[in-house]
């Protein structure tokens, strides 16, 4: 079985516009390996024709297995059996067990929801209750999370991404119909360069609104908009959050 993390989850999630059966899973695995997040050989699969909702529930039969084969080869073998991998286990020496999931929230939507979840540990402790050693560990874990966000958001075909403690990155339908769980929206959003001029517009809107949210150009691939930080007691900037959601609702 895939090794589970304990306690609350730190989640990095993203929406991708890509063919599920091609290389999304393998590309994500290769990217994670570059950050020393190693594939464990444990996967969960279901029938290729099955629908997997945003919560990971499949309309088909779920099957778990362990294989020493590389993930790409295992995926090919399962494909011959008309199956697809929907979860895979990874492990990082310091961050611990990690679970990579791929789901298709809406039938024939053309996009897929990818998330990587691992233990929040010290980031799950209220800021004011953290001890000195907790603060140091929390800072490392949050920086590690942001690096993962940058990595995933910068991947080809990423529409947008987000990260935070116990968060759910909303789908385009949830954004446009305002059916999001606002208490679980990302602490930081990642907007890829694929949004081009639109990305510049939203960052300018956030800055001109006087929002204290930090707009950071991480690199040529990703711009981050931080609504709140789990390292600070400063309240979430819901104005900046609303600008990001409004922007995504018009460009997707």
Residue ranges and their predicted role:
Residues 39-40, 128, 132, 136-137, ...:
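A broad structural signal for short, well-ordered beta-strand segments within beta-sheet-rich domains
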Residues 47-50, 165-169:
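Short beta-alpha junction loops
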Residues 19-38, 154-160, 168-252:
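C-terminal interaction module
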Residues 141-167:
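Acidic, metal/cofactor-coordinating or nucleic-acid-engaging core segments within structured domains
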Residues 1-60:
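Leu/Val/Ala/Ile-rich N-terminal alpha-helices, chiefly Sec-type signal peptides and the beginnings
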Residues 110-138:
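A solvent-exposed, charged loop/short amphipathic helix patch at secondary-structure junctions
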Residues 22-32, 131-151:
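Well-ordered, non-membrane alpha-helical segments in soluble/globular domains
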Residues 37-112:
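Short, intrinsically disordered low-complexity segments
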């Amino acid at each position: 079985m895939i090794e589970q993390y304990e306690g609350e989850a730190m989640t990095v999630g993203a929406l991708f516009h890509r063919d599920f059966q091609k290389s999304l899973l393998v590309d994500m695995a290769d990217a994670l390996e570059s950050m020393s997040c190693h594939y464990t050989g444990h996967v969960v699969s279901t029938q290729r024709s099955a629908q997997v909702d945003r919560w990971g529930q499949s309309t088909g039969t779920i099957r778990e297995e362990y294989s020493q084969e590389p993930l790409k080869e295992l995926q090919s073998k399962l494909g011959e059996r008309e199956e697809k991998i929907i979860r895979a286990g990874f492990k990082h020496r310091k961050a611990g067990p990690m679970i990579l999931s791929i789901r298709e929230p809406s039938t024939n939507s053309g996009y897929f929801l990818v998330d990587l979840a691992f233990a929040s540990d010290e980031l799950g402790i209220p800021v004011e209750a953290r001890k000195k050693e907790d603060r140091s560990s929390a800072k490392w874990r949050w920086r590690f999370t942001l690096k993962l966000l940058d990595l995933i958001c910068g991947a080809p075909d990423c529409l947008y991404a987000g990260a935070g403690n116990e968060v759910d990155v909303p789908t385009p339908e949830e954004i446009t119909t305002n059916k999001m769980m606002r208490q679980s929206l990302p602490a930081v959003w990642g907007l890829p360069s694929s949004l081009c001029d639109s990305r510049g517009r939203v960052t300018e809107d956030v800055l001109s609104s006087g929002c204290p949210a930090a707009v950071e150009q991480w690199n040529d691939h990703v711009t981050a908009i931080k609504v709140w930080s789990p390292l600070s007691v400063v309240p979430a900037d819901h104005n900046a959050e609303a600008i990001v959601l409004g922007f995504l609702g018009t460009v997707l």
